[in-house]
Amino acid sequence: MGQPVVHFEIMGRDAARLQSFYADLFTWTINADNPMKYGMVDRAANLTADGIGIGGGIGALPEDMPGGHVTVYVAVPDVEAALAKAASLGATRLMGPEKVTDGVEIGIFNDPEGHLIGLIKSAA
């Protein structure tokens, strides 16, 4: 058995903007009430009915660090609707929806700071 993904981190220049973007897009519960304003994505508050989901963090890059991107795939009930909502919040659609295998559809976008984010819907 492989090791599961248990955390993700999305870092950018404007942490508050990114935290707001993801809270609005996916209705994530994010708590940045700490000295670093690091937004902890609450795993327990974001689980599916089957207990599926991971927690993570959204924060600001130190000034001396170059930018980058993180790719995570987020399960959504409707890839097209999620891509459209992401675009309405300032994202750039890159791909999709696209069927990759039977019952699996994906989409990819760049968030407002250029992070590559994937969306996935599976028939499981």
Region locations from a protein language model:
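Core segments of cupin and vicinal oxygen chelate
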Residues: 2, 9-53
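Conserved active-site tyrosine of GNAT-family acetyltransferases
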Residues: 18-22, 86, 114
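Vicinal oxygen chelate
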Residues: 5-13, 33, 61-85, 89-124
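Short polar/acidic secondary-structure junctions
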Residues: 46, 63-64, 98-99
